[in-house]
Amino acid sequence: MEVTTRLTWNDENHLRKLLGNVSLSLLYKSSVHGGSIEDMVERCSRQGCTITMAYIDYNMIVAFMLGNYINLHESSTEPNDSLWFSLQKKNDTTEIETLLLNTAPKIIDEQLVCRLSKTDIFIICRDNKIYLDKMITRNLKLRFYGHRQYLECEVFRVEGIKDNLDDIKRIIKAREHRNRLLADIRDYRPYADLVSEIRILLVGPVGSGKSSFFNSVKSIFHGHVTGQAVVGSDITSITERYRIYSVKDGKNGKSLPFMLCDTMGLDGAEGAGLCMDDIPHILKGCMPDRYQFNSRKPITPEHSTFITSPSLKDRIHCVAYVLDINSIDNLYSKMLAKVKQVHKEVLNCGIAYVALLTKVDDCSEVLQDNFLNMSRSMTSQSRVMNVHKMLGIPISNILMVGNYASDLELDPMKDILILSALRQMLRAADDFLEDLPLEETGAIERALQPCI
């Protein structure tokens, strides 16, 4: 008779998002294999990485993950890392909380016991009961502590990861840092409330990843990969209209305090790509959303939707030069000249700027262990220095990301780079706002000089 798990497809999918691309194989099911702890351990020992799940009710699962179920009849004094998590269904959503501990289970009096500092924190008891200490329930945000009956206990072998939890621990810590970055950006407010939303201009060569960066930011805040902005190729620009994209916090959430402005790509050929005479109008806020670009003719004040008196909120507050990290060393002279021409206009307007190096192959290698800074390899370091020399951008404002292009699922490492870059852009924009002359900051509602 085939033994089937109580774990739903939806719950298993949430675990894959938590742990990465893994598969689960059922080793033990208490209602089929019996409730003896010794039998469970014997069946699950020497199986590599495992997850032990206790189904508290139909809406709550408590589980722990081990790098290996050691032979618990043998004495062992070595501590063992374990990952604890809870899955709780609330209002048609599944919430997951995690906790990393340095403890290993042992059989004591026919019970499976985990101790921390000589205190029992978790026990799988006889008669389908478990015990959870307050420390566990508080960290996992459970609504109970102490003894509780469970419906079923199952143990799975986790395939697709190593037999230690180092990779998983890094993923969990990455998710925690990612969530802190999300919270920082959600709580962000532009300097002195001079504007309600920061406008960030994405400009760079054709195919460098401008539209993909917007899609990536939106994907993170929506919780799944999206593709609102159509993405072009490395040869021809598909962005033909100026777009001012807002980003909502979730599908039906409120708009976040920034906008990403997407442009036609720069092209080294004459009469192709973004018209260079459009740049000042974009920077000063004269170009309307959905304006149809013309590579050979810039927008003029005679255009029906030209914004003749842009206010501070209409202007660009930070420019991101989007460059393919793999092509920086091979930028041909005409393309480099156009990038420098854009940069000259940005400097003339006094606008903040950063460089965004896209198409990073391995985001996990770029991040330092604490996720706070980027660990640059010799190759990436040389390209960063090349951009620094070309445009004079401070090294701290040269950022690396890997956009969501062909991915189907979100990656916490990739999210951290994207969110860190976005946060740095917002900080740069704050510097720009703080440095504005008093005649502008003192009368924000007053229209600025006509952009002609």
UniProtKB/Swiss-Prot annotation:
One of its GO terms (biological process) is immune response. InterPro entries: P-loop_NTPase, TLDc_dom. Keywords: Antiviral defense, Cytoplasm. GO terms for cellular component: cytosol. CDD domains: Ras_like_GTPase. Its main location: cytoplasm. Residues 1-159 form the TLDc domain. It is found in: Cytoplasm. The keyword Disulfide bond does not apply. Induction: By type I interferons. By M.tuberculosis infection. Interacts with FKBP5; this interaction modulates IKBKB and IKBKE kinase activities. Belongs to the IFI44 family. Type I interferon-stimulated gene (ISG) that plays a critical role in antiviral and antibacterial activity. During bacterial infection, promotes macrophage differentiation and facilitates inflammatory cytokine secretion. Plays a role in the control of respiratory syncytial virus/RSV infection, reducing the ability of the virus to replicate. Exhibits a low antiviral activity against hepatitis C virus. Also acts as a feedback regulator of IFN responses by negatively regulating IKBKB and IKBKE kinase activities through interaction with FKBP5. This is Interferon-induced protein 44-like.
